[in-house]
Amino acid sequence: MNRLLVLLALLAVPQPVPTDWRTAPSSDWRELFDGKTLDGWVVKLAHHELGDNYGDTFRVENGVIRVMYDKYGDFGARFGHLFYKQKLSHYVLALEYRFFGEQVKGGPSYAKLNSGVMVHSQAPETILKDQDWPISVEAQFLAGGRTTMNVCTPGTEIFMKGEMVKAHCTNSTSKIYGNDEWVAVEVEVLGSERVRHLIDGQSVLQYEKPMIGGGVANGFDPAIKKDGTVLDSGYIGLQAESQPVEFRNIRLLNLSGCSKPGSPAYRAYFVHADDTRCTTR
């Protein structure tokens, strides 16, 4: 059989089409926060070494992760992130957030009622001590009469409808939420192909082809910021930007996995093949 016939034979075999990830059973979702500890997470605050949780900025109280500043005098530009330790490429991240309390003294005006979650972030161990923002893409959480689940791009660029977005932040189409209201959000990340922001299961923003580039991030290692590098994977990080905020019900659905339908580890909603997972869940 010549190569053409082999190719035609392969093309004739029906290929499984991924189903919507909303069909995934709840047991397939992984809890990233155990409600008791910050196990599996690492803190990085600007002007502090990796792992230095100055002032207990990130803490666990009453089953939620809280960003608190009661042990601070002044904010001191200590922009912070709590990173999950696993690198990810194709997934859905779900969580709930709520603002509370007053912004700490010295926090910038734009950071009032402002937080977010970073995706496709550089590895936390590559963030320099005095670096303000990780090179990443941010799903931005806002209150105070503003839309939420916007997108911001510290050290990155994104595309919408085939055009590079020039603005650092772009608003979503969300409704306005109360200042202290719990908001349930999801970020669907499909490698470098697409990122989608959802609230209560409804899409409010979508963009494509995230890559390293642009400004805003400062104090980074030039060896890390290689402009034009397409981002197809990275880390997630919860943000501490001077406003007290709570996070809960942090869950992950991996969309990368076994592509062989005969394997117990196969899932019809997988969109990216990783056949090293065919013997495990």
Report each predicted region and the residues it spans.
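Sec-dependent N-terminal signal peptides
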Residues: 4-12
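Extracellular calcium-associated, cysteine-rich motifs in secreted modular proteins
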Residues: 256-281
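Carbohydrate-interacting regions of secretory-pathway proteins
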Residues: 16-264
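N-terminal export signals
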Residues: 12-13, 275
